[in-house]
C-alpha cells in the first residue's frame, strides 16, 4: 500500500521507494508530488525523515498521513489505482502500427467479411489501403454528415477499423438488420454530436447513451460502442474526443481485466485529466497508451 507524507509547509507527497545512491551508497528517499504535474523528487533518507527548526519550533520535515487525506485534493490521474506508462507523450496522433504493410490482420478479416456477405458494395474499400486510410475516410464522412442522412457506411467503416473482434453483430443472433439498428444508432450519434465540451454532465449523458445502446443492440459491447462514440465525437471535439474503452485500455489504465460501462465515466474522467496535465488531446493520448501496451505484451 502506498504511503503519503505531508511536508511541513503543507504540500503532500507519495513515497515511491527507499533506495541507495548508486555512487555514495547512502540511503535516499524517492517521492512524488501529489499536485500539479506529479514531479518526482529525491532526498537523503535522514533529511526526509529528519526534523526541521522553523520559527523556534522543531517539527518533522515530513509527517505521514492517510490515503484519504492525501488524495482529497490530488489530481485524479495521480491516484495510485490508475496507471499511465512512463513514456514521452507527444501531441501528434501516431499512425497505426505498420501502415505500409496494408491492413492489419483483424481489419483485413473484417473487410473480407463485409465484402463476402455483401454488406457493402465491391467498391466500398477502393482507395483504402491500410487502417489509417479507413480511419480518415470514416472521419471525413462524419464531418460531412447531416442528421437524417443514412449513416450505414460510416457504421461499417468504424466496424472495419475496429477489427475482427467486432464481427459478432454480423454473424450472431438473427444476423445484421440495418433497418432495426439505424434508429438506435442515430440516437447514439445525436448524443455525440450534441456534445460540445467535456464536463461531468456531458460524460454522464454519453455514458447513459452507451448503456442504452448496449442494452438494445446485442453482439457489439462497450468496447466497440466506444469506438463509435470516439469517432463521432471527433466531429465536435476534434483531437479531444473521449477515448475508446477496450480490454487493452481497461487493463493498462484501470488495471481491470473486464470492460463494462460501470467504470466508463471514471475512465473517461481520469483520461481527460491526464490529457489536460500533459497538454495534449485525448485521441493521441489513447493511441500512444494503446500502442505502448501492445508493444509490451
Regions found by a protein language model. Name each.
Residues 72-137, 235-297:
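C-terminal accessory module of base-excision DNA glycosylases/AP lyases that mediates lesion recognition
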Residues 151-155, 222-225, 282, 286:
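Short runs of predominantly hydrophobic/aromatic residues within well-ordered alpha helices
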Residues 142-220:
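Helix-hairpin-helix/helix-loop-helix acidic hairpins
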Residues 205-255:
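Catalytic DNA-binding helix-loop module of base-excision-repair DNA glycosylases/AP lyases
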Residues 162-167, 224, 233, 293-294:
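Short alpha-helix boundary/capping elements
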Residues 17, 157-160, 227, 251, ...:
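Residue-level signal for well-ordered alpha-helical scaffold segments within enzymatic catalytic domains
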Residues 11-14, 137-142:
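Charged, amphipathic alpha-helical segments
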Residues 1-71:
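Mixed-charge, low-complexity intrinsically disordered regions
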Amino acid at each position: 500500500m502506498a504511503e503519503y507524507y505531508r511536508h511541513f509547509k503543507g504540500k503532500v507527497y507519495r513515497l515511491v521507494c527507499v533506495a541507495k545512491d548508486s555512487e555514495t551508497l547512502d540511503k535516499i528517499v524517492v517521492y512524488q508530488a501529489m499536485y500539479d504535474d506529479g514531479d518526482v523528487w529525491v532526498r537523503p533518507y535522514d533529511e526526509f525523515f529528519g526534523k526541521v527548526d522553523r520559527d523556534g519550533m522543531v517539527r518533522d520535515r515530513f509527517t505521514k498521513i492517510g490515503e484519504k487525506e492525501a488524495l482529497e485534493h490530488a489530481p485524479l490521474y495521480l491516484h495510485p489505482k490508475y496507471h499511465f506508462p512512463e513514456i514521452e507523450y507527444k501531441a501528434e496522433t501516431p499512425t497505426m502500427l505498420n501502415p505500409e504493410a496494408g491492413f492489419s490482420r483483424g481489419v483485413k478479416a473484417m473487410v473480407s467479411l463485409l465484402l463476402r456477405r455483401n454488406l457493402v458494395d465491391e467498391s466500398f474499400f477502393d482507395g483504402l489501403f491500410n487502417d489509417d486510410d479507413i480511419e480518415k475516410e470514416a472521419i471525413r464522412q462524419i464531418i460531412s454528415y447531416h442528421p437524417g442522412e443514412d449513416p450505414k457506411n460510416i457504421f461499417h467503416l468504424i466496424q472495419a477499423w475496429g477489427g475482427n473482434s467486432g464481427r459478432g453483430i454480423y454473424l450472431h443472433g438473427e444476423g445484421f438488420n440495418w433497418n432495426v439498428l439505424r434508429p438506435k444508432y442515430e440516437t447514439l450519434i445525436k448524443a455525440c454530436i450534441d456534445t460540445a465540451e467535456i464536463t461531468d454532465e456531458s460524460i454522464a449523458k454519453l455514458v447513459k447513451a452507451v448503456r442504452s445502446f448496449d442494452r438494445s443492440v446485442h453482439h457489439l459491447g462497450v468496447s466497440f460502442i466506444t469506438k463509435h462514440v470516439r469517432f463521432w465525437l471527433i466531429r465536435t471535439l476534434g483531437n479531444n474526443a473521449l477515448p475508446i474503452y477496450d480490454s487493452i485500455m481497461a487493463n493498462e489504465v484501470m488495471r481491470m481485466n473486464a470492460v463494462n460501462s460501470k467504470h466508463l465515466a471514471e475512465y473517461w474522467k481520469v483520461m481527460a485529466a491526464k490529457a489536460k496535465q500533459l497538454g495534449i488531446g485525448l485521441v493521441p493520448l489513447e493511441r500512444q497508451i494503446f500502442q505502448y501496451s501492445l508493444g509490451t505484451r
